[in-house]
């Protein structure tokens, strides 16, 4: 295999939250001179730190992590934005002679980057407000009938009472002049010319849940509540006008409910652990149904981490 061919092979390290993928990616990156593409839709926000298990400043100093600390809460950024930008950066890194790792567990980001996405226009606040007024004035059946006339195939997939997708479908038509059905046929494959080896970290469900619970306790000991208080004070009164899901992140939303006196502290912590476990289940379902993953046992100690690092490095370098 020629060096130019090797540069076309990259490794994606996936796994449910708390499975150890970040530590493995960091270990591999140090060995093969790689930069990391973080496929984490929450670590990209500067304001979210402890609750997102963001890499330490020392880790970020040693290895370049892309899409970490790059946006502020409220900055619009879609899975399509991520896939386009990540694809461009991956090519630039490979062109420079370095290796690339993808590491993360955000399903929408991974779906767009690894499986491709429809090139839909970004949300338009003014157009969406116009449709919202029309919805309130004439009702969802009126909008649904309009969509049925314009894009019957898309309308057939919708329940007219689920107004978010209904409004988005009409917004796309009015912004682009094309139906959603037409747009989805123009599927973009960001990494079609690059060989991506997808590896997933697997561990027994009871052990995963134990790690999730223990990590939640560690986050609290590291100041998660104090971080939530700062976010609550600065952003919570404006949640309705901030167009991001960042503030609905598990670990923060439960503490916001506590700070808003809608629940007690003990219940909030219980819910953080429960919701994180539920999130891990959804991630595993996605990995198994949507991606072709080579599953590996998650390392439980430094020796196993070292052995797995060596094995993964060989997948990329061929040595």
From Swiss-Prot:
Site entry: Interaction with substrate tRNA: 106, 128
Binding residues for ATP: 15-22
GO molecular function: ATP binding; tRNA dimethylallyltransferase activity
Residue ranges, annotated region (Interaction with substrate tRNA): 40-43, 164-168
E.C. no: 2.5.1.75
InterPro entries the UniProt entry points to: Dimethylallyltransferase, IPT, P-loop_NTPase
Cofactor dependence: Mg(2+)
One GO biological process term: tRNA modification
First-tier enzyme category under EC: transferase
Reactions listed under catalytic activity: adenosine(37) in tRNA + dimethylallyl diphosphate = N(6)-dimethylallyladenosine(37) in tRNA + diphosphate
Disulphide linkage map: none
Keyword entries, A-Z: ATP-binding, Magnesium, Nucleotide-binding, Transferase, tRNA processing
Assembly notes: Monomer.
PANTHER family: TRNA DIMETHYLALLYLTRANSFERASE
Role: Catalyzes the transfer of a dimethylallyl group onto the adenine at position 37 in tRNAs that read codons beginning with uridine, leading to the formation of N6-(dimethylallyl)adenosine (i(6)A).
Family from the record: Belongs to the IPP transferase family.
Name the UniProt record assigns to this protein: tRNA dimethylallyltransferase
Biological classification of the source: Bacteria, Pseudomonadati, Chlorobiota, Chlorobiia, Chlorobiales
């Amino acid at each position: 295999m020629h060096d130019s061919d090797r540069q076309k092979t990259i490794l994606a390290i996936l796994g449910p939250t708390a499975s150890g993928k970040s530590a493995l990616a960091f270990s591999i990156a140090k060995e093969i001179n790689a930069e990391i593409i973080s496929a984490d839709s929450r670590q990209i926000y500067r304001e979210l730190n402890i609750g997102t298990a963001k890499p330490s400043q020392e880790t970020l100093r040693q290895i370049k992590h892309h899409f970490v600390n790059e946006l502020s809460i409220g900055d619009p950024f879609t899975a399509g934005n991520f896939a386009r930008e990540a694809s461009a950066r991956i090519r630039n890194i490979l062109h420079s002679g370095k290796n690339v790792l993808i590491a993360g567990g955000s399903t929408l980001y991974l779906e767009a980057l690894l499986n491709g996405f429809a090139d839909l226009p970004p949300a338009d606040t003014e157009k969406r407000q116009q449709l919202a007024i029309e919805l309130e004035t004439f009702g969802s059946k009126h909008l649904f009938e309009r969509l049925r006339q314009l894009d019957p195939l898309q309308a057939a997939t919708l329940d007219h009472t689920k107004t978010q997708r209904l409004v988005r479908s009409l917004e796309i038509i009015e912004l682009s002049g094309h139906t959603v059905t037409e747009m989805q046929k123009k599927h973009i494959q960001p990494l079609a010319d690059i060989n991506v080896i997808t590896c997933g970290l697997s561990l027994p469900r009871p052990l995963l849940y134990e790690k999730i619970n223990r990590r939640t306790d560690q986050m609290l000991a590291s100041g998660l509540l104090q971080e939530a208080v700062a976010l609550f004070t600065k952003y919570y009164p404006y949640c309705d006008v901030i167009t991001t899901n960042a503030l609905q992140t598990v670990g923060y939303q439960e503490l916001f409910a506590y700070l808003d006196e809608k629940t007690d502290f003990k219940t909030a912590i219980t819910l953080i652990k429960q919701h994180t476990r539920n999130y891990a289940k959804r991630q595993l379902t996605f990995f198994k149904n949507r991606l072709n993953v080579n599953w590996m046992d998650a390392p439980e100690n430094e020796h196993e981490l070292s052995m797995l690092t060596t094995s993964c490095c060989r997948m990329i370098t061929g040595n």
